[in-house]
Amino acid sequence: MKTGIKHILIILALMVPTACSDWLVLIPPQGLIREEFWQSKEDVEAVVMGAYQEFAAMDELLFKYGEIRADMVVGDVNQGNDDRKVAEGNIYSDNSLCNWNQFYTVIDYCNEVIKNAPEVKKVDNTFTDYAMNGYLSEVYWLRGLAYFYLVRVFGDVPYITEPTETD
């Protein structure tokens, strides 16, 4: 029994120093790393399209914020409790429809393009000033539209112009 414990302790003693190493690099599950992503005009276009897609996914939510609150839609017995709260003017945090996450995801995508598109232009010779300015114009407009809806629905909201720095 003592020799078995000795063997286990020796094996553990040999394994512990190799368990932690400086060469260990964690890669995000999505497989994309910020330093490797912003390399071409296609990367810029992908983020711009992602911002549009995220905004388009909010269509039902934007409808509810406008039409239900304006009394333009009549509920029925199948109307959810959160819809009823919006109709009553309850746009507080206890209502699951009143979530800023999608708006700020769009804003973050736009901020990423605003920050990184000029850097991509330096490394991608096919990325022209014309194309870059077109993408920048789109994301400035889209970010402004997101803030327009946020302010219209919720009033004062945080104004963020820098992208998040996480992978």
Q: Where in the sequence are the language-model features?
A:
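Conserved, well-structured interaction surfaces
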Residues: 45, 53, 81-154
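Bacterial Sec-dependent N-terminal signal peptides
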Residues: 1-29
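Short, well-structured active-site flanking segments
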Residues: 152-162
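A structural signal for short, hydrophobic/glycine-enriched beta-strand patches
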Residues: 69, 75-85, 90-91, 162
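Short linear capping/connector segments at secondary-structure termini
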Residues: 29-33, 89-91, 126-129, 161-167
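Membrane-proximal, proline-rich intrinsically disordered regions
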Residues: 20-67, 92
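Short, compositionally biased low-complexity segments
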Residues: 20-27, 79-83, 157
